[in-house]
From Swiss-Prot:
The protein's name: Motility protein A
Transmembrane stretches, start-end: 2-21, 34-51, 171-191, 201-222
InterPro entries with a match to the protein in the record: Flag_MotA_CS, Flagellar_motor_stator_MotA, MotA-like, MotA_ExbB_proton_chnl, MotA_N
Gene name of the record: motA
Bilayer topology term: Multi-pass membrane protein
Protein source organism: Escherichia coli (strain K12)
């Protein structure tokens, strides 16, 4: 959980440094300031988003604390699946894939790759475009344009939760100032008190500015970046499918088509040419494929 680790680092360094200067943590405990900042931030989030955006943001929050499912093994499964589908269509004709795409969960080919079956976005993307290709009513350029449009739509939808969190993060420092000003107003209204008490009230008011900035840049705004990164991973998978299928439509053999798809992947997850070649060879031999997946 890198997010939780990052939060611990933020809290440890900020409050640890404060203690090193001789400060008291008790002075930073100001529930009223926190209520003002958090409440105003939540309120601005509700005001600035429609119901669809709010629901999408809440739905995206659990994804922040899950490990990425788009690993090297996932990409290898994707390329192997596409290879098997393309090889079958080349050997037996495109119409031989009808049963596979009509009910992929009962397909022998798809069943070999449970990680792909578990990803409804990728499964629908693959099946839908194979169905369009089989129909024969669209040429390569039309299919490519439609794929680009769907990928762009996915990215736009994924950007909504990220933007919502980013805007909340941007607003928190301002709400911290609001809380601080209200605290200063309270302190000035108590100007007849002794200097020691007045100083404590002003110090408490300044905690609002501190909390607003800390919550914004240490906790909320980084979450928007994580959501964008997760969206980019899904888009990369879709681009890999797009390039692979279009290469096959343009006449390239399945081994070359999956090589096109491999080249679109990020270097951190991209299998080497030899790894992909060995994986494709294993695909050609069902027994060897089963052994490889069990391992």
């Amino acid at each position: 959980m890198l997010i939780l680790l990052g939060y611990l680092v933020v809290l440890g360094t900020v409050f640890g440094g404060y203690l090193m200067t001789g400060g008291s943590l008790g002075a930073l405990y100001q529930p009223a300031e926190l209520v003002i900042i958090a409440g105003a931030g939540i309120g601005s989030f509700i005001v600035g988003n429609n119901g669809k955006a709010i629901k999408g943001t809440l739905k995206a929050l659990p994804l922040l604390f899950r490990r990425s499912k788009y690993t090297k093994a996932m990409y290898m499964d994707l390329l192997a699946l596409l290879y098997r589908l393309m090889a079958k269509s080349r050997q037996m004709g495109m119409f031989s894939l009808e049963r596979d795409i009509e009910n992929p969960r009962e397909s022998e080919i798809f069943a070999s790759y449970p990680r792909i079956l578990a990803d409804s976005v990728m499964l629908d993307f693959i099946v839908d475009y194979l169905r369009l290709i089989i129909s024969g009513h669209m040429n390569t350029f039309e299919i490519e344009a439609l794929m680009d449009e769907e990928i762009e739509t996915h990215e736009s939808e994924a950007e909504v939760p990220a933007n919502s969190l980013a805007l909340v993060g941007d607003s928190l420092p301002a709400f911290g100032i609001v809380a601080a000003v209200m605290g200063v107003v309270h302190a000035l209204g108590s100007a007849d008190r002794p200097a020691a008490e007045l100083g404590a009230l002003i110090a408490h008011a300044m905690v609002g500015t501190f909390l607003g900035i800390l919550l914004a840049y240490g906790f909320i705004s980084p979450l928007a970046t994580v959501l964008r990164q997760k969206s980019a991973e899904t888009s990369k998978m879709m681009q890999c499918v797009k390039v692979t299928l279009l290469s096959n439509l343009n006449g390239y053999a399945p081994p070359i088509a999956v090589e096109f798809g491999r080249k679109t992947l990020y270097s951190s997850e991209r299998p080497s040419f030899i790894e992909l070649e060995e994986h494709v060879r294993a695909v050609k031999n069902p027994q060897q494929q089963t052994t490889t997946e069990e391992a």
